[in-house]
Amino acid sequence: MKNKKIIIIGAGLLQVPAIQIAQDMGLYAIVFDYNKDAHGMKIADLPMVVSTRDVDGSVRAARDLSKQMEINGVITVGTDASTTVAAVANALGLPGNRFEDAYA
């Protein structure tokens, strides 16, 4: 049973290994991407159609999810979505870079 839940921002080919590794570690992979047909969306435990560049939309989606389940982390790999990750982490009280630092 997958207890801990992680949001992975992005579902392209570069994020697929991160999604797979998270799942191999027993994590429940919630994946945000604007493309519902992206490779990572097909293997996500919970795919969510949200643009990686839509910081406010990603924060709203993450906050909504956090009312239904505990979110334990948020990451991205191989993308320029560090500001989105920072904003989501900050909004949910998770460890991460400050938005100002990610934006710099």
Residue ranges with predicted function:
Residues 1-103:
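ATP-binding N-terminal substructure of ATP-dependent carboxylate-amine bond-forming enzymes
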